[in-house]
Amino acid sequence: AEQTLRTKSVVVAAGAWLPRLVGQHVSLRPLHAVRAQPSHFAPRPGFDDIEMWPTFIHRGLSAQPEVENSWYGLWTPGEGVKVGSHLVHDELDLDNRSFEINRKFESALQEYVAQWYPGLDADKVTSTTCIYTNEPNEHFILDRKGPLTVCSPCSGHGFKYVPAIGKITADLAMGGTQSVKEWQF
């Protein structure tokens, strides 16, 4: 149903679609959206304390030399340990997004897991795709212009800071100002 809602302010947190939605109202830094492909790996039998799995960021080489990388991982209840890449992604066309799994990259993740994480079964993998958005300096865009608050924590990078980002965004929406220059428009 169509409805008109009038408010004193609005928050737009639209990820890769942010330039299309607010680009005519504010001057944004460029955003680059790519197709990321994290995978979930099952624990090996006998690895009973999987819920205690630490979140990690690992800068290093995979078993495939052309894939120098920064890897991340975290326990996801019901799915296993999520492992992904911060640096290696496929280019993305937002209007024609593919959900097809890149088997070469999945293989690189499997080899990495087999090399570094003996508690995980590299053969028991479930991969998915998602959109990963960044700006050139990997900073956030959290700012306000008039009644418009823009929140772009830039995908996985911002996920680590959700409580702080939420607090800052709420403050901006209520009339606060942004003092961190790197996060301004």
Language-model segments: what does each one mean?
Residues 14-15, 152:
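Glycine-rich, N-terminal phosphate-binding loop of Rossmann-like dinucleotide-binding domains
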Residues 15-16, 163:
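Alpha-helix N-cap/helix-start capping motif
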Residues 4, 9, 16-146:
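Active-site substrate-recognition segment that forms the wall
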